[in-house]
Amino acid sequence: MEMNQTETLIPAARNVIRVLGYEIEYSKWTICFALLAVCIAYDQISYQMQKGHIPGPRFKIPFMGSFLDSMKPTFEKYNAKWQTGPLSCVSVFHKFVVIASERDLARKILNSPSYVQPCVVDAGKKILKHTNWVFLDGRDHIEYRKGLNGLFTTRALASYLPAQEAVYNKYFKEFLAHSKDDYAQYMIPFRDINVATSCRTFCGYYISDDAIKHIADEYWKITAAMELVNFPIVLPFTKVWYGIQSRKVVMRYFMKAAAESRKNMEAGNAPACMMEEWIHEMIETRKYKSENKEGAEKPSVLIREFSDEEISLTFLSFLFASQDATSSAMTWLFQLLADHPDVLQKVREEQLRIRKGDIDVPLSLDLMEKMTYTRAVVKECLRLRPPVLMVPYRVKKAFPITPDYTVPKDAMVIPTLYGALHDSKVYPEPETFNPDRWAPNGLAEQSPKNWMVFGNGPHVCLGQRYAVNHLIACIGKASIMLDWKHKRTPDSDTQMIFATTFPQDMCYLKFSPFDASTVDWKNSKEAFSNEAVSAATVETESA
């Protein structure tokens, strides 16, 4: 009986082997299609399991998912996604993405370092380099950030103003020339002035004007590569590849500046830029530790030694953070003021009043503390048209973001900042440009949790005071030196996404010299009280 069973099974086995062998030999396409079907099924099942019950595409386009949408993002598509619910999702190639649109969920993500870490964008580590401090986490991030805090103290910010003002004076002349004959697009000139301001603030005059122009051109490629999700492999001559090459170019300039700055500080000279300020703090710490004498004056902060490469990578990240965001804000700011001449008039009156009619009074922090209405204008612009809409994070471990949904490990989770800044309960008529809402006792100043322009939590923007002061100083000085008109088009109010937001038509303006003597500043009244606004500003920025 057993023999008969064995004899029966052997031919059957041989038959199966023969059949499989035949298929493999003569029907390779069948095998390929079968494997493809298995991969598609796995990709789809994986997406459905990660998606759970939250809104998102019902089915994922095999393998690529929403890649085509990610290549050409629009504000309208983002906004439609936010409207689908507090949490929604998409999938692009290998990356599952969860988007949080509500304020409290966004704040929860930003304040959950044990679950998430910044990734900027999917290719961020490849472009900015994985050793960049912005990708540090936990204790390492805290220690590194401590070494940077001294660069943004009140004293340090004051020391940067002369270089910033010199850039404004230079580029205001270029603004006049750029639209001498007719209206011209100003998105690029605004990017140029911000790159120049950043380079002069960060590196002083260790970087030449020609080098600044070169850096601006290279940074355009870096920005272009910073799409939310890129093709997973870096192929030659793709956006990410060009972004990496541009990073290498910019790094060479910063490395050279760091070496020269270190040499200058070791010689005992006073710091005149952010890079020198940082190296000076290192030298002071080193001296204090080496002398180890009783009664020796202890530096305000003891920091470790940072290498030239660490310094350069840090300023690479600073330039990325400041250049795109402030370029966006400045473009919207000039456009909004041209569209609201009554607001521009109030800015001019304030600027001339605090300067007592002298437009050549140099910038100082004391002077800027008096620019209360100008500050309100800047804050309202940042609220209405926030440069950064969302901040991508990588999930380190399964993240129970709500009681009924857990974001899977290695997914990307994105807190949205826009919703909190357009909450009609806090900002009535949120689509209206109204600087008066920032009066010291107004609802806006009483709701600091909604002020999320610069993020929140342990990775909140380190240079937010610098960025706001830069915008206040620039627009304040421009208001009394320049006049400008805006040529509106059907796309003027459409938000284009290029890392940050810009007017779709790239902002058509025409500049001309302004005669400050035409402003009756002596009889003008203060919009807000200086003391009240200063106190409210501190509260809002520290929330």
From Swiss-Prot:
Keywords: Heme, Iron, Lipid biosynthesis, Lipid metabolism, Metal-binding, Oxidoreductase, Steroid biosynthesis, Steroid metabolism, Sterol biosynthesis, Sterol metabolism, Stress response. One of its GO terms (cellular component) is endoplasmic reticulum. It comes from the Eukaryota. GO terms for molecular function: C-22 sterol desaturase (NADPH) activity; heme binding; iron ion binding; monooxygenase activity; oxidoreductase activity. Its EC number is 1.14.19.41. It catalyses: 5-dehydroepisterol + NADPH + O2 + H(+) = ergosta-5,7,22,24(28)-tetraen-3beta-ol + NADP(+) + 2 H2O. Its cofactor is heme. GO terms for biological process: ergosterol biosynthetic process. It is an enzyme of class 1 (oxidoreductase). Disruption phenotype: Abolishes the production of ergosterol. Leads to susceptibility to cycloheximide and to staurosporine, but does not affect tolerance to nystatin and to amphotericin B. It holds the Pfam family p450. Induction: Up-regulated by sre1 in response to absence of oxygen. Heme binds at C461. PROSITE patterns: CYTOCHROME_P450. Interacts with dap1. In Aspergillus, the biosynthesis pathway of the sterol precursors leading to the prevalent sterol ergosterol differs from yeast. The ringsystem of lanosterol in S.cerevisiae is firstly demethylised in three enzymatic steps leading to the intermediate zymosterol and secondly a methyl group is added to zymosterol by the sterol 24-C-methyltransferase to form fecosterol. In Aspergillus, lanosterol is firstly transmethylated by the sterol 24-C-methyltransferase leading to the intermediate eburicol and secondly demethylated in three steps to form fecosterol. This is C-22 sterol desaturase ERG5. It comes from Schizosaccharomyces pombe (strain 972 / ATCC 24843) (Fission yeast). The lineage of its organism: Eukaryota, Fungi, Dikarya, Ascomycota, Taphrinomycotina. The gene is erg5.
